[in-house]
Amino acid sequence: ETDIEIMMSVDLGIDLGTASVLVYVKGKGVVLKEPSVVAFDRDTNVIKAIGEEARLMLGRTPGNIIAVRPLRQGVISDYTVTEKMIKYFVQKALGKRTFKKPRISICVPSGVTEVEKKAVEEATFAAGAREVHLIEEPVAAAIGAGIDISKPCGNMIVDIGGGTSDIAVISLGGTVVNTSLKIAGDDFDEAIVRYMRKKHNLLIGERTAEDIKIKIGTTYPLIEDETLEVRGRNLVTGLPKTVTETSTCLLYTSDA
């Protein structure tokens, strides 16, 4: 590589999450945030949509179109699809500018194995990166929150993602102790799906469950209860059904 090619390159930061992908361009900030979802034709294996467009297909696609999330619990479950998804998001973030291959820093959960780290690194190189640097999610979260991680004092970081929850104590620029739990946002969504089925005989999809969580989900009782109309399919009659749910009731979804 020549010095000119390197100067024409660009630095990217990617938060490769189970639920969503964020892309940061140095000097510009976060330029992209989209769901980690890919839709493809079951018969031809051709990708039909990636990101937000694919998310809208979750649970609502015709029989031959499948919408999948290529990462599960923070790690790659489908290497080829993940590679194509990263490449798509990188190209979308950079647009039609004539940058050479970018240098990419990409987040990984703190508890992943060396093999899982290698898979992320290789997928990012295959997607067109010139250099790849892996950074543990709690460290990235601390820096993003404005914490000076170089100081000789401990800061506990709790990063709840879609597939994993990372907890770490950071001091003097490094991780003192950390753990990664495979319980996170996706599990909350699944608990809401079970709860709606058990309480209302109502079948809802992942997308609806996530909307419920975002709009009225809470971990403690609110002074004023919030309500939301939820649409789904009646499991008894098979017909569309609408129910009204409250934020207080959702406190007990984990019991469903």
Model-predicted regions and their roles:
Residues E1-I160, A168-S254:
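Nucleotide/phosphate-binding catalytic cleft detector across ATP-hydrolyzing
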